[in-house]
């Protein structure tokens, strides 16, 4: 049977120490609980304070809010008014600046125009003085300028044409023009009908002026200078005998045909027959000098002459090779 062990009896000191220890532990636990309770109470108080504050914020009246809105609106209106005043001031400054700039520009334009007029007056006076020159040659530059202006306006050379002479006196002394259409027994000193030119023969008035560069291709008789002065200028009728004797007509006609076959100078259309009087004129008709006849024919024929005429050939005789130039 097991033996029973008896607990030894505690001494008084040990019993008091154990009692103290237990009491301290209890006290410590109670303090901890109290601290926890205090913390919980503090938290609850803080929570209540937050709730109260929130409730107070929620309890704020609508009038206070309206008052705040009115204050903000007044502040905004003041800012807008200040902005408007600044804008008006800026506009005024810009307008004044524009007026000042226009005034300066107008003053500058006035000064520039005045200076330009003054310089133009001085330049014109200097130019007139340089043009006048010395007193001895005062009128000469103006005359030369007028002459140059006239040359520029009217060309270097002006040709004056006139109607073709209707009288046979213009061709007096030239044996080639002795066979005009008229009475068989008419003399050269009497008036005869004008020679019959081509259907497209141009007629010009005495007052009409033709410039030299453009006159030559326009008139069909103003061509290049021909080597002969006695060219036939129209259609003539070879049926009139004139001053030839009947015995020599046949031989002269044969010579003329032979010459027409040999020559290489012909018109664009056909060779016009020439009267035998042009080859073998009467001895009485050759009494007048040929030089005045040429001058008279050139002056009265109505054809415009150039400043440099072509070479003049003497009258063709029977001994020379007969070549005829027809217009």
From Swiss-Prot:
It is found in: Nucleus; Mitochondrion; Cytoplasm, Cytosol. GO terms for biological process: B cell differentiation; negative regulation of B cell receptor signaling pathway; negative regulation of fat cell differentiation; negative regulation of inflammatory response; negative regulation of JNK cascade; negative regulation of protein K63-linked ubiquitination; negative regulation of toll-like receptor signaling pathway; negative regulation of transcription by RNA polymerase II. One of its GO terms (cellular component) is cytoplasm. Changing residue 45 to R: Decreased stability of the protein, probably due inability to interact with TBL1X. Abolishes sumoylation. The keyword Repressor applies. There is a cross-link at residues 45, 71 (Glycyl lysine isopeptide (Lys-Gly) (interchain with G-Cter in SUMO1)). Residues 61-94 are annotated as: interaction with SUMO. Sumoylation regulates its subcellular location. Sumoylation at Lys-45 and Lys-71 regulates the shuttling between the cytoplasm and the nucleus. Sumoylation at Lys-71 is required for interaction with TBL1X. Sumoylated at Lys-45 and Lys-71 in mitochondrion. Desumoylation by SENP1 leads to relocation from the mitochondria to the nucleus. Ubiquitinated at the C-terminus by SIAH2; leading to its degradation by the proteasome. Interaction with TBL1X and methylation at Arg-323 protect GPS2 against ubiquitination and degradation. Residues 253-271, 317-327 have a biased composition (Polar residues). Residues 14-109 form a coiled coil. Disruption phenotype: Embryonic lethality. Embryonic fibroblast cells show reduced corepressor function of the N-CoR complex for PPARG, leading to constitutive activation of PPARG target genes and spontaneous adipogenesis of the cells. Conditional knockout mice lacking Gps2 in B-cells show developmental defects at multiple stages of B-cell differentiation, caused by of aberrant activation of 'Lys-63'-linked ubiquitination events and altered gene expression programs downstream of the misregulated signaling pathways. Pfam families: G_path_suppress (PF15991). The keyword Lipoprotein does not apply. The modification Omega-N-methylarginine is found at residue 323. Residues 26-65, 178-208, 253-285, 300-327 are annotated as: Disordered. Changing residue 327 to A: Increased stability due to impaired ubiquitination. Changing residue 254 to A: Increased stability due to impaired ubiquitination. Keywords: Activator, Coiled coil, Cytoplasm, Isopeptide bond, Methylation, Mitochondrion, Nucleus, Repressor, Transcription, Transcription regulation, Ubl conjugation. Component of the N-Cor repressor complex, at least composed of NCOR1, NCOR2, HDAC3, TBL1X, TBL1R, CORO2A and GPS2. Interacts (when sumoylated at Lys-71) with TBL1X; leading to protect GPS2 from degradation by the proteasome. Interacts with UBE2N; leading to inhibit UBE2N/Ubc13 activity. Interacts with TRAF1. Interacts with TRAF2. Interacts with TRAF6. Interacts with PPARG (when in the liganded conformation). Interacts with (sumoylated) NR1H2; interaction with sumoylated NR1H2 and NR5A2 onto hepatic acute phase protein promoters prevents N-Cor corepressor complex dissociation. PANTHER family: G PROTEIN PATHWAY SUPPRESSOR 2 (PTHR22654:SF2). Key regulator of inflammation, lipid metabolism and mitochondrion homeostasis that acts by inhibiting the activity of the ubiquitin-conjugating enzyme UBE2N/Ubc13, thereby inhibiting 'Lys-63'-linked ubiquitination. In the nucleus, can both acts as a corepressor and coactivator of transcription, depending on the context. Acts as a transcription coactivator in adipocytes by promoting the recruitment of PPARG to promoters: acts by inhibiting the activity of the ubiquitin-conjugating enzyme UBE2N/Ubc13, leading to stabilization of KDM4A and subsequent histone H3 'Lys-9' (H3K9) demethylation. This is G protein pathway suppressor 2. It comes from Mus musculus. The lineage of its organism: Eukaryota, Metazoa, Chordata, Craniata, Vertebrata.
